[in-house]
Amino acid sequence: MLLHINPAYLFKLLHGFPPWIMPTDGNLGDKNFQMGKPGHREGATMHVKKYLLKGLHRLQKGPGYTYKELLVWYCDNTNTHGPKRIICEGPKKKAMWFLLTLLFTALVCWQWGIFIRTYLSWEVSVSLSVGFKTMDFPAVTICNASPFKYSKIKHLLKDLDELMEAVLERILAPELSHANATRNLNFSIWNHTPLVLIDERNPHHPMVLDLFGDNHNGLTRSSASEKICNAHGCKMAMRLCSLNGTQCTFRNFTSATQAVTEWYILQATNIFAQVPQQELVEMSYPGEQMILACLFGAEPCNYRNFTSIFYPHYGNCYIFNWGMTEKALPSANPGTEFGLKLILDIGQEDYVPFLASTAGVRLMLHEQRSYPFIRDEGIYAMSGTETSIGVLVDKLQRMGEPYSPCTVNGSEVPVQNFYSDYNTTYSIQDFDWAHCYSDLQMSVAQRETCIGMCKESCNDTQYKMTISMADWPSEASEDWIFHVLSQERDQSTNITLSRKGIVKLNIYFQEFNYRTIEESAANNIVWLLSNLGGQFGFWMGGSVLCLIEFGEIIIDFVWITIIKLVALAKSLRQRRAQASYAGPPPTVAELVEAHTNFGFQPDTAPRSPNTGPYPNEQALPIPGTPPPNYDSLRLQPLDVIESDSEGDAI
């Protein structure tokens, strides 16, 4: 039998070099070459391979126990009370301790479920604390109840006012004929959004009638319609239709006053939308005419200390102590003398008659650098009175997700800002906006969507107000006060002001303290772990280490199961492979002969004794014994030999 040896290994062996340090370039005299010291990279790679080999052998071997042996070992070595008694006592006590262990395990799991569910409910507890320190005075926004001066916008509302007067005549005297009076009216606005009368006496067949009937088309209204409108059960509504007129909705009102006011505001909004905002600012009340006197603490102030903004419903509004460009003003003491005092002229004689039905000042207290939603959160101060407002400060600190759906700055609220795509003028001039807005406003689903989408602020400051009023000025001092104010504003010796146009405000801190209402987690992670550990220790005398032991036994069970499944798959594969061969497996002699038959000569068929040998027949070599497996011929690095031996020992 021939023995094949790699020449490279033989060459290295003859020259006395171990095969793992033999130079690859053949330069044996290189000074940089160091005997017996492999490179750092090769050494690190060898250690990693050895570590992975050990881990692979350990995974293949498994825990080395059966299921029963693992259970017995766990019960005998665990620190949990109960399992050890199951394997150490007699049959009756084993059964008793087994049932007790199951019962207490179920109790622990039940208690754990209650505590985890309570923790995941994200309940909060509220604490109230009172503090004393110098506080920032709130920002004060004031607006006139009338957005514009009627003398400056009268030319814009000429057609609308004439149509409004005709509507009032129809409501007050419907039995009179107004055919001649309505022929000169501009019905272009009316035809798109008219006021109608709805007869609801028959709820199954309600009748809808135009307030003007067919007069604006040159015809007279029937007497039957007049009788219906005079009867009880006839309500006024505003018809809102889409741009193509295919879809219409009716907004009902219980009073004609509400109906005509809302209709007039809607039409006026469309008219004002066609006017540039700068012109609208000039048509509203300027600060130097509205703010007659100002005093904050002991320091005088004027309209220049206010920031002007334009609000669509109230025109020019003025904000004191907004803090956008300057530092917020503090207040160190409570009382009227340390607050803000204002005397305002609302100019009630120049109010728009159909647009502003309330006379007075709309005001709101809010935080610095926050936009005032004065239409929703503001209050009115009546003209001819001195209104004193005492302020109490409440600071609210809510917890965010997952305890409450609050927002810090509103950036995460998923609401599309239409002002980034369309400007305000374009949106209002679209004739279809009223119908769309009315549908959304009356939609219950849309309200629920808004409630779920809009979030309250996590940190908020609320100003609780105590309001008191008194007549101002009194009849005894009315003459000289109005003389002085008229001279200061108009440099006139005559009185240009009246009681119905004057408002005096006093805004101050009622108490020198503030309340902080703060939310905190009612059940935090410390509470949860304490209760879980307490229940586990009380019922079973266990701890976290006992849970780790239980997790270890579960991992061993899974490990053994995987090894058994792999072994089963291998055995099935071997059975399929053996089933594909019909004959018996080859013997050792046949395998040796296959390795020594280098000529690959076919076996000879049996011949009769009369036939002679073939002429070219050659005698086959007699098979010898296989060569011994000498360890000296296994030319491998010593590190590899060590790793193999250690892997076998794992």
Swiss-Prot record:
Q: Which residues are glycosylated?
A: 244, 305
**GO MF term (any one):** ligand-gated sodium channel activity
The way its activity is modulated is described as: Originally identified and characterized by its inhibition by the diuretic drug amiloride.
Modified how: Ubiquitinated. Can be ubiquitinated at multiple sites and undergo monoubiquitination and polyubiquitination. Ubiquitination by NEDD4 or NEDD4L inhibits the ENaC channel through endocytosis, intracellular retention and degradation of its individual subunits. However, some studies could not confirm the ubiquitination of this subunit of the ENaC.
| UniProt-annotated stretches for the region Disordered | 600-650
Q: Its Gene Ontology biological processes?
A: sodium ion transmembrane transport
Name the UniProt key words of this record, in alphabetical order: Cell membrane, Cytoplasmic vesicle, Disulfide bond, Glycoprotein, Ion channel, Ion transport, Membrane, Phosphoprotein, Sodium, Sodium channel, Sodium transport, Transmembrane, Transmembrane helix, Transport, Ubl conjugation
Q: Which cysteines are joined by disulfide bonds?
A: 143-317, 229-234, 241-248, 294-301, 406-458
**Signal peptide location in the record?**
none
Q: Which residues lie on this side of the membrane: Cytoplasmic?
A: 1-95, 564-650
Q: Which chemical reaction does it catalyze? A: Na(+)(in) = Na(+)(out)
Q: Where in the cell is it found?
A: Apical cell membrane; Cytoplasmic vesicle membrane
GO cellular-component term (any): cytoplasmic vesicle membrane
Tell me where the transmembrane regions lie. 96-116, 543-563
- Biased composition (Acidic residues) is annotated at 641-650
Q: How does it sit in the membrane?
A: Multi-pass membrane protein
Q: In chain numbering, where does the motif PY motif fall? A: 626-630
UniProt topological domain (Extracellular) ranges: 117-542
Phosphoserine PTM positions read 643, 645
Q: Which InterPro entries match?
A: ENaC, ENaC_chordates
Indicate the quaternary assembly: Component of the heterotrimeric epithelial sodium channel (ENaC) composed of an alpha/SCNN1A, a beta/SCNN1B and a gamma/SCNN1G subunit. An additional delta/SCNN1D subunit can replace the alpha/SCNN1A subunit to form an alternative channel with specific properties. Interacts with WWP1 (via WW domains). Interacts with WWP2 (via WW domains); inhibits the channel. Interacts with the full-length immature form of PCSK9 (pro-PCSK9). Interacts (N-glycosylated) with BPIFA1; the interaction is direct and inhibits the proteolytic processing of SCNN1A and SCNN1G and the activation of ENaC.
Q: Which family does it belong to?
A: Belongs to the amiloride-sensitive sodium channel (TC 1.A.6) family. SCNN1B subfamily.
The role this protein plays is:
This is one of the three pore-forming subunits of the heterotrimeric epithelial sodium channel (ENaC), a critical regulator of sodium balance and fluid homeostasis. ENaC operates in epithelial tissues, where it mediates the electrodiffusion of sodium ions from extracellular fluid through the apical membrane of cells, with water following osmotically. It plays a key role in maintaining sodium homeostasis through electrogenic sodium reabsorption in the kidneys. Additionally, ENaC is essential for airway surface liquid homeostasis, which is crucial for proper mucus clearance.
Any idea what this protein is called? Epithelial sodium channel subunit beta
Q: Where does this protein come from, organism-wise?
A: Pan troglodytes (Chimpanzee)
Source species taxonomy: Eukaryota, Metazoa, Chordata, Craniata, Vertebrata
